[in-house]
Amino acid sequence: MSPHKISQKGMFAAIATFALFASTANSADVRYKDRLFEVEKKKDVTFASDVPYLSSPHMLTQVIQSMAGETLYFYSSENEVENKPLLMDLYTPTGDTEKKRAAVIVSHGGAMIAGAKDDTDQQTVNYCDSLAARGYVTASIQYRRGVTVSGSGMSYSIDSVDFARTVYRGVQDVSAAVRYMRKNADKLGVDPNRIYLIGNSSGAILSLENIYAKKESDFPSYMNKADAPKLGAIDIYGEQGVDSHANGAVALWGAIHNKDIIGDNKTPVLLVHGTDDETVLFKTGRPLGGGYSMAGSTLTIHTPTLYGSFVIDSILTAKKTEHETYFVDGAEHEFYDDYEYEKPVQDKVFNFLYKLASAENSGSTAIKHRVFAQAQNSAIQMGKGNMYFNIARGNNLKYAIMDIRGRSVMTGKASAGQSVDLTALNNGVYVLRVQGEKAIRFSITR
């Protein structure tokens, strides 16, 4: 046979080989969509220096720490401060040679009085690591926490003005993180026009405020208290000379302080929220409001009125501004703790960011898409004093209990009608996860 001729069998083999190659090429892993890299983490990177932190802890902080094992940042005064740096943990794709990568800044939750940049319970570390493995440069930031408490004896209160001032400080910090990324884009291998935010709860509020609040006058003038230090401009700390606002944001159960600041802003956002959220309300209201008691003391919290995802979505829809939503009917706060919703929420977040990061024009890529889902009632029932729990349905379900630092302290399996004894746990705050059910936070105090 001539060397220039190919048999029918050989031709089929060649075609099959080509088809296999083409199929493999088409299914190749894609940056920003698939896991491509190992991840390198650099802790405590300074993104702003000489920033004033409140430094006079209130006695309630110590009481709660000793009784519940949880640190809540309450302070006696704003007039005592200590200048310290703002820090972030930086996650980068190992061995990546790309010079202009999309970046994501993640802000934890915690009602402005708790939470941390290395908080595994809030998906902060998970999101940073997972996105960096997909080719992003990511950062988990530690914004300033803490609000002043007034009162004496056994009765204390937090004023809505003081809460508003705390939020403003957090907005300053998120803005400083954006400017750090943008100013140091070449050094970090970041595209300054593709810097995005993810925020959880209070972190979502800060992220949305970064998108929509453009100047100091967008915030209420009542925050300027005569007996407290001046807060300064939004961009007073950290890098200067570059824009403070991100190119897109994911708000997990977030809100804004004034619906009018949205204006004609076209920045793409993804809003994720449960309709029965009583912490950051889905529509309009005062988060965390009410009275709390511990060890004979009462703490009354007054917070500013906030406008939740329903209001933001309604305004953006009326203005025909492209954005995305994922609303779950009947779900409460932080429903990504639910086994049922953990992956759907992550998929929504990652797909939204992929569309932004992979487009040439990151300012106009979000497709209007409103999604509603239906949540079911929890089958978990906590017993007296949280010393045990029951499961109302299911068989041989896996459960896990983690402490406030995200460490597993108890695991097992349980079935409907069975009680699980928790008396071996020490005093503290825990998260209970049962397969297929919404996670429950509970505390043990004896």
Predicted features, each with a name:
Residues 29-99:
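N-terminal cap/lid segment of alpha/beta-hydrolase-fold proteins
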Residues 96-101, 107-151, 257-259, 278-282:
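Short substrate-entry loop that stabilizes the transition state in hydrolases
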Residues 168, 172, 176-265:
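Primarily recognizes the serine-hydrolase "nucleophile elbow" in alpha/beta-hydrolase
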Residues 271-273, 277:
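Short beta-strand/loop motif that positions the catalytic acidic residue
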Residues 306-364:
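C-terminal catalytic histidine-bearing segment of alpha/beta-hydrolase fold enzymes
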Residues 358-386, 392-394, 445:
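Residue-level detector of functionally pivotal "anchor" positions at catalytic/ligand-binding pockets or at interdomain
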Residues 401-409, 430:
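Short, glycine-anchored, charge-dense loop/turn motifs used at functional sites
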Residues 429-446:
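C-terminal tail/sorting-segment detector
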